[in-house]
Amino acid sequence: MAEAETRLVIFDCDGVLVDSEPISVSVLVKAMNDLDVPITEEEVYGRFLGRSLATVIETMKTEYNVHPGQEFLEQIRTDLYTRFRRELKPMAGIAETIDTLGIPCCVASSSQVERIRLSLTVTGLIDRLPDIFSATMVKHGKPAPDLFLHAAHEMNVEPANCVVVEDSPAGIEAAKAAGMRVFAFTGGSHANFSGYRAELDRLSPEAVFDAMPDLIHLVRKHKQDGMHL
């Protein structure tokens, strides 16, 4: 059966548009360790990649009996934003890829809108991606489909006509649950942590790629496939 034509590309932000995961994980691990939560960067990658900070906090409460207050959130925000402004880089080739795709694009991320906008501004992508959707806008974050369905609705595109570009297992699950095709991007600096690629393969995305310009061919291939309905 032929696929529906691709009319919208939905990008995750962290680890897809910007190479932020190593910075984010480093900041989170330090903040958790400061509260005597014995967790490593490897564990954070495996358990929380692509998930919201609310999920992290709930895990701290239920598994470690640690109840972080507002100061925990402020520490993360301050440390993260400082390092983003100093260190954050766009994913190699992403600006040119967006310019070449020739179809509407938007961002759907587990992060707060303020953080997404900062990431895109620091890396020079904000003007290319003005349509931003955050997990704070929906009841359930990834791996639930709510965020991607909300983005598609707001962009006036049916789920079947959307392609999601994700780097996390939770994001891939969310895209599939939303009835969208999903391409797994493995070109971020975090892609070599133990078990990462095997977990992505287990979830069977429509494609796996590690160089952002390859997305142009993948989207055009699926766009052409859809035109033969």
Give the positions of each predicted feature.
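Active-site neighborhood of HAD-like aspartate-dependent phosphohydrolases
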Residues: A2-G46
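Asp-based, Mg2+/Mn2+-dependent phosphohydrolase catalytic module
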Residues: A2-R7, A95, D99, Q112-V113, ...
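Short beta->alpha linker loops
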Residues: I23, F48, S52, Q75, ...
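An amphipathic alpha-helix signature
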Residues: V25, V29, L53-E58, L73, ...
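A short, Lys/Arg-enriched amphipathic alpha-helix followed by its capping loop at the start of a domain
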Residues: K30-L35, G93-I103
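Helix-loop "lid/cap" segments that line or gate small-molecule binding pockets
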Residues: A31-M32, S52-V66, S119, A152, ...
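Short helix-capping segments at alpha-helix termini
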Residues: D34-P38, Y64-P68, G124-R128, N156-V157
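Metal-dependent phosphoesterase signature
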Residues: P38, E58-E96
